[in-house]
UniProtKB/Swiss-Prot annotation:
GO terms for molecular function: proteasome binding. Residues 1-83 are annotated as: Disordered. It comes from the Eukaryota. It comes from Talaromyces stipitatus (strain ATCC 10500 / CBS 375.48 / QM 6759 / NRRL 1006). This is Tethering factor for nuclear proteasome sts1.
Length: 315
């Protein structure tokens, strides 16, 4: 008879480990991931793993070169220094720059010749603007309520500005005369503007103070005569005929009180009968009551002879 051997009781906690767990392969996780296909979510997990990994396990980053910036290095020592020539010239106004240039040319005369040949020729508009600036300074210096003829007190106040204007006229006028100026239209345009400025010169109660004004009229009249002679040599004075200079010169002569009569006579001699009727007080025009329509204009417009009786019958 078989005897049963009593087995000792098994503790309950041993039963917790008696379950069968799924068999696991002994291969490494890297081998398992290589044996199956990669999925999109696996790539995201790998990125998370790499980002959470320690720097020692992360791949090495190759340094990229930074762009080279052209920056001025700050000077270690700050000290005062003079401005460079371009920066210095930027701070100078017109008057200061003119004074510096004149001083340099006076010290070095050879530079003056270089400036004269390098500088552009002054235009009529710029020159007349300079003269108008002198004229404006003169007009603003005249005391208020002086009347048409100014007193000696007013003359003493403005004589320096008057001399500046007269000197400028005397210096600028020869520049626009032949042979220095080859274009007659430029010369006539300047003389027209310069004569207007002379008209605005003040008149003085003391006759000797008017010498400067009378001298200016005399010089500008000689300039008109010279330019008219030069213009008459070119194309028979066609520019004088069709430019209306006969009318302008006649108006200047009237405003000056007949001080430009020599220029009027020269123009009448240059144009002959073609311009005589356009000049009041010269030739036949003086007997026609100042008729402003010249024979030249009548011929060009085709109205010459209209209104005149036509003779019929034997001559």
């Amino acid at each position: 008879m078989n005897s049963l051997v009593a087995t000792p009781p098994v503790p309950p906690h041993f039963y917790e480990h008696s379950r069968f767990s799924p068999s696991r392969s002994m291969s490494t996780p890297a081998q398992q991931s290589s044996n199956r296909k990669r999925k999109a979510e696996d790539d995201g997990n790998d990125v998370d793993i790499r980002m959470s990994a320690s720097p020692t396990n992360s791949p090495a980053f190759t340094p990229r070169p930074l762009p080279n910036r052209q920056m001025k290095r700050s000077r270690p020592n700050v000290s005062g220094r003079p401005l460079s020539l371009p920066r210095l010239l930027e701070t100078l106004d017109t008057d200061a720059l003119r004074s510096v240039l004149q001083a340099v040319c006076q010290r070095h005369p050879e530079l003056g010749d270089e400036v004269v040949h390098t500088a552009p020729r002054p235009s009529v508009s710029s020159t007349l603007q300079v003269l108008r600036n002198y004229q404006s300074t003169l007009q603003t210096s005249i005391p208020l309520g002086s009347g048409e003829y100014l007193s000696d007190y007013a003359y003493n106040r403005v004589k320096q500005h008057l001399f500046n204007l007269l000197d400028a006229l005397s210096d600028f006028t020869p520049h626009f005369l032949p042979p220095n100026e080859s274009q007659t239209s430029v010369s006539l345009t300047y003389l027209d503007g310069a004569t207007d400025i002379i008209h605005s010169l003040p008149k003085w109660q003391t006759p000797r103070h008017n010498i400067g004004r009378d001298s200016a009229y005399e010089e500008i009249c000689k300039a008109w005569v010279l330019v008219i002679r030069e213009a008459a040599k070119r194309g028979g004075g066609i520019q004088l005929q069709y430019g209306g200079w006969d009318q302008k010169l006649a108006k200047h002569n009237e405003t000056s009180g007949g001080k430009l009569q020599d220029a009027i006579n020269e123009l009448q001699n240059s144009l002959g009968w073609m311009g005589s009727s356009a000049l009041p007080g010269v030739g036949a025009a003086g007997t026609q009551g100042g008729d402003q329509t010249s024979i030249r204009e009548q011929l060009l417009s085709g109205t010459y002879g209209m209104g005149m009786p036509l003779k019929v019958g034997p001559w």
